[in-house]
UniProtKB/Swiss-Prot annotation:
<dbReference type="GO" id="GO:0003924">
    <property type="term" value="F:GTPase activity"/>
</dbReference>
<keyword id="KW-0547">Nucleotide-binding</keyword>
<dbReference type="GO" id="GO:0016320">
    <property type="term" value="P:endoplasmic reticulum membrane fusion"/>
</dbReference>
<dbReference type="InterPro" id="IPR027417">
    <property type="entry name" value="P-loop_NTPase"/>
</dbReference>
<keyword id="KW-0342">GTP-binding</keyword>
<feature type="binding site">
    <location>
        <begin position="57"/>
        <end position="64"/>
    </location>
    <ligand>
        <name>GTP</name>
    </ligand>
</feature>
<feature type="topological domain" description="Cytoplasmic">
    <location>
        <begin position="784"/>
        <end position="852"/>
    </location>
</feature>
<feature type="topological domain" description="Cytoplasmic">
    <location>
        <begin position="1"/>
        <end position="738"/>
    </location>
</feature>
<comment type="function">
    <text>Cooperates with the reticulon proteins and tubule-shaping DP1 family proteins to generate and maintain the structure of the tubular endoplasmic reticulum network. Has GTPase activity, which is required for its function in ER organization.</text>
</comment>
<feature type="topological domain" description="Lumenal">
    <location>
        <begin position="760"/>
        <end position="762"/>
    </location>
</feature>
<keyword id="KW-1133">Transmembrane helix</keyword>
<keyword id="KW-0175">Coiled coil</keyword>
<dbReference type="Pfam" id="PF05879">
    <property type="entry name" value="RHD3_GTPase"/>
</dbReference>
<keyword id="KW-0378">Hydrolase</keyword>
<feature type="compositionally biased region" description="Basic and acidic residues">
    <location>
        <begin position="834"/>
        <end position="845"/>
    </location>
</feature>
<feature type="domain" description="GB1/RHD3-type G">
    <location>
        <begin position="47"/>
        <end position="283"/>
    </location>
</feature>
<dbReference type="Pfam" id="PF20428">
    <property type="entry name" value="Sey1_3HB"/>
</dbReference>
Amino acid sequence: MNGHFAAVGNGPTAQQYEHGIQVIDEDKAFNTNLNDYLGETRVAEAGFNYHLISVFGSQSTGKSTLLNHLFKTEFSVMSESARRQTTKGIWMSKNKRAGANGDAATMADNILVMDVEGTDGRERGEDQDFERKSALFALATSEVLIVNIWEHQIGLYQGANMGLLKTVFEVNLQLFLKDRQSQTRSLLFFVIRDHVGNTPLANLRDTLVQDLTKIWSTLSKPQGLEDSKIEDYFDFAFAALPHKILQPEKFLEEADKLSTRFTTGHRSAKDQEFVGGVFLPEYHRRIPADGLSVYAEGVWDQIVNNKDLDLPTQQELLAQFRCDEISREVFVGFDSVIVPLEEQQAEATRLGKATVLPDLGVTGAGTREKCVKAFETQASRYHKGVYSVKRGELESKIDARLKALYQTQLSAAHKSGVAAFSDAVTNAVKAGQKAGGYEFAEIVDKQKKKTLEFFKKEAQSLLIQGVAWTNFKPQYRLFEKELDEVSARLRKEEMRRLAIRVERWVKSRLGDSIGVEFNKLGSGRGGSGAPENGEKPATEKDLWDRIWNTFSGIIREAETRFADRAKSFEASPEEVEVGLWRLRRKSWVALREKIEEEMMESNILMKLRENFEDKFRYDEEGVPRIWRPTDDIEGIYTRARESTLGLIPLLARFRLAETYAPPDLPTFVGPQPAGAEPEDEEDLAPIGGVDEEEGKSLEEEMTVLSESKRQDLVVRFKKMADGVYVEAKRSAIGGITQVPLYFYIVLLIFGWNEIVMVLRNPMLFMLLLVMGGGTYVAYTLNLLGPMMQMANAASNQAVEIGKEKLRDFLENNQTMRQAIAMPPRSQDNGIGMDRLDSRGKKAQEVEEDDDI
């Protein structure tokens, strides 16, 4: 009994699949391997291009035999020696006539034939439950219901299977109540067996139609269907076959002809007989072949559990199942492409790198389209509503993954773009600095356009037509905004560098100008700060006025330079205002540092000494003083000292001579601009009188020397001045020789004769007069010391030369050299004038290296 088929519960083999499969066994168990069978027979991939036929009839009436001859199947047939049930349950096999004897051109593709267990069998007896359930199953799944009937049974009720047909009609109404919208039709194909030809086929047809109409009229119809006709739900077709035993050749011939009717047909109206094949489009249950097994299993589950069979619901459930299954299948391909990209991004994120994946947009869009199209190809055959929902879910699932991938890509492009922009601007600025000039605003504008184009290109490459979230305009605006922020930061840094350069320039100018002003302290009498061209020097009391005016002029020029250069950066007025405010503050601090440098203890003492010496050692015309005992050294010293001491209070505080008050520093610096940020104040030193909260007043800010330093400076200066005074006094007194008066009397008495002799001799008198005048001049000019040193050196040199000459004489005389055992003279013992010291002695020899 179909032992060569793949039965329920078995682990079927490919060879068993070649014959067919048991769909439902006699115990009402469904075969879950049906989908494998459809795959093995290549029906599953046919989509809607398949047809399902079921055969009904009484037991042992030759249903399986009929199918085997029509479709070349191998269903088991009853043994003629023992009339008993052969087909148990429902069996299925694929049409095998296709492709043989040229029949492939006349029969439809992928015809599946179900051999249903016969009715009215003694094995089941009164139990008609399986009969009803199998009829409902066949009607819910099949396009064509073949009713196998013998000619002599026509006109009978039980013999002609009228009871079975009534069951078919009843379950059809049951199905229709659940599916009024589609109103699926079915074909009842009556195959009249053992037709001998005495009764024309047309008469037999009329008899059957009358019987069917009568049965339909006796049915209890649902509300609203009372006037319905059988033709509203069923089409009828009729065929007759000769007796198989009595006319075997004729039977085979007619069976072959009948098989050709199982092809696609058509008709122009419902009331017209269809022409061509028996498979009309309205018969198809619109269940894709790859979902047929799931659909059939769901239908049978509802039937066997005595639940109301709701085909639309079953179709929806099938659609949900298959769409989910197809979605998982296509998502595997999606993962195979996307997961490696996600792993690359995850690795880059872990390493903290901004990695832009190449061709991500093309890959993502192509993979998405491929997956959606694959889903559409397979799933669009199912329930449209379910398909639409599941497609939306698939697209949402794909888009969620792609969105995360794309956003990470844009984030990486964002970061790398910002970094590239910053580096490009920085490098261009450095190159411009080396070249000697650059326009910061042009550099920023050029690099910004280039970077925006890069990001725009990357964002556009990720665009998917019809997908709203791939319109990355917000991300583009955010990127542009951050570039503006980076531009502002770079501009601020550039302005900081500009400020530093201007500050250096200010410090350099202040270093020269302020140093010159301090060098002018008391320099009107030929000191270190005396004017070169003899113009009248500036007064000491307006020192701070000159310093403030010089400082103000330098700052005005610096502000002009800063503002002009900042405008070329396209800096805002607020940024320029903040920069100028910082410049004024830092410039004032630089001035204070320069003043403190000039007012260091060693420097100020030197300035005071120079000031004092300028007044003490030089007269009003700048001529050096030669101190004589008759000079008023004490008076000059006192005036010079008091004048210099008067500088200390002047230098102690920064005050203008005109107002005798500090300069208006708060007005000069100005209030803090509204655009100043906390970081703009971090490197600024507090200024007294400006930053009141720092607790330092303007008076304290303008104090250069504290009271203790002033007192210490006065004491040290007085000690230094006293030393200069003592030195001057000593030089004046040191020129006087105290000779006793009696010495001149004794000299006159004892030297009278010599005096008379000199006076009487004009030549001697003139010589004495010249020598005396020369000595007086030498004494007056303090040249006696140097002259004595020169004379001493000359005498010493003469002695050395004499010794050398004597040595030469002894060395040249062989007899004398032998007598005193004198060694020969070396070649380098000569005496040169440059070998003698200031006293005429021979200087110590310094050996020289012959290699130099």
